Regions:
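Short acidic-hydrophobic, aromatic-tinged amphipathic segments that line or gate anion-handling sites
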Residues: 58-59
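Short active-site oxyanion
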Residues: 32-38, 53-54, 78, 104-105
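Short amphipathic alpha-helix with an adjacent loop that forms part of the alpha/beta core around
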Residues: 30, 65-76
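Solvent-exposed loop/turn segments at secondary-structure junctions
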Residues: 43-46, 62-63, 85-89, 112-116, ...
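Second-shell loop/turn segments in exported
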Residues: 11-18, 53, 82-86, 103
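Catalytic cysteine-centered active loop of the rhodanese-like fold, especially the PTP/DSP P-loop
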Residues: 71-116
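Flexible, polar/low-complexity N-terminal or interdomain linker segments that lie immediately upstream
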Residues: 1-37, 45-49, 129
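Active-site neighborhoods of enzymes that stabilize oxyanions during catalysis
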Residues: 120-129
Length: 129
């Protein structure tokens, strides 16, 4: 079934509930049952060093370049954005951009890469081959 999205993100610009925040547990469940698309908002270098298994690299600064890819995505799919964790806002920015494109199911995983590897969840990339 659908993964419950708990909290509502507070947009620092005061735009209210633009995207949801998803917990590590819920992000992992969505990963395991294959319902979510994970988007890595970090740089290509960071992505290649290591990323959540199956995630697609979509750096926030290259968002416009990614529009052809995004326009082909199913709007029914849950999209989960992430970056490095607590010190990184790129996942929130990316989630906000996706919401502006009218993707209805967008969540940002604020714990990000750091929380995911700390939990020992599936990863890919050069770091651990």
């Amino acid at each position: 079934g659908d993964v419950a999205i708990a909290a509502i993100a507070i947009d620092p610009n005061g735009n209210g509930d633009i995207a949801s925040n998803i917990s590590l547990k819920d992000a992992y469940l969505a990963h395991q049952n294959g319902t979510a698309l994970f988007l890595d908002a970090r740089s290509p270098d960071e992505y290649e060093a290591g990323h959540i298994f199956g995630a697609v690299n979509l750096p926030t600064h290259a968002f416009m370049d990614s529009l052809p890819y995004l326009e082909n995505l199913s709007p029914n799919r849950l999209i989960i954005t992430y970056c490095d964790g607590a010190d990184c806002n790129a996942s929130i920015d990316l989630a906000a951009n996706l919401k502006l494109m009218d993707f209805p199911k967008v969540a940002y995983f604020f714990g990000g890469w750091q929380e995911w590897i700390d939990a020992g969840y599936p990863i890919a990339g050069n770091t651990h081959e």
